[in-house]
């Protein structure tokens, strides 16, 4: 049985997304991307764009489940608030599309893919490439999309079929 997982790295300016399939203990890369909103847009328009794009991703790729990064302590309150706003729009979109989702902290994600919760972003990308059987020079759409793929792998590791 194949499980298709949508990983989401939320943000107001950039929402990373990644789709992979899991069959047994093997992962297969499907697609990754980034939804970009611009600061000149109103908050309403930014959140609507994020939701609309997530709907298209869900409709096009038909994931079985989603995983999204949980809010963690942030030094910058403004950033934490904007990420929370984007997360709210994304989670509502999951609910409207009847898509189950799970939340993971950055440390859970890093620990799940590497066995160590404090690895650097460059190491995360390296591990993702190995786990997904990618060439070493594969270029992700963005740092956000590679984080989203890590979230999808994390979910697959925590929910073994």
UniProtKB/Swiss-Prot annotation:
InterPro entries: RNaseH-like_sf, RNaseH_sf, X-over_junc_endoDNase_RuvC. Its cofactor is Mg(2+). Keywords: Cytoplasm, DNA damage, DNA recombination, DNA repair, DNA-binding, Endonuclease, Hydrolase, Magnesium, Metal-binding, Nuclease. Mg(2+) 1 binds at residues 9, 144. GO terms for cellular component: cytoplasm; Holliday junction resolvase complex. Its main location: cytoplasm. SUPFAM superfamilies: Ribonuclease H-like. Its EC number is 3.1.21.10. NCBIfam families: ruvC. Belongs to the RuvC family. This is Crossover junction endodeoxyribonuclease RuvC. The gene is ruvC.
């Amino acid at each position: 049985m194949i499980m298709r997982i949508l990983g989401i790295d939320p943000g107001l300016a950039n929402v990373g997304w990644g789709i992979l399939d899991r069959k047994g203990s093997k992962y297969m890369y499907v697609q990754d991307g980034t939804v970009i909103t611009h600061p000149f847009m109103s908050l309403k328009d930014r959140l609507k764009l994020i939701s609309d794009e997530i709907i298209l991703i869900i409709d096009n790729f038909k994931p079985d489940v989603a995983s999204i990064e949980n809010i963690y302590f942030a030094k910058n309150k403004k950033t934490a608030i904007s990420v929370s706003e984007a997360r709210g729009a994304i989670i509502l979109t999951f609910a409207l599309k009847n898509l189950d989702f799970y939340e993971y902290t950055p440390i859970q994600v890093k620990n799940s893919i590497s066995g160590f919760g404090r690895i650097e972003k460059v190491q995360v990308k390296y591990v993702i490439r190995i786990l997904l059987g990618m060439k070493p020079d594969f270029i992700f759409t963005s740092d956000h999309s590679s984080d989203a793929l890590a979230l999808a792998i994390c979910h697959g590791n925590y929910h073994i079929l």
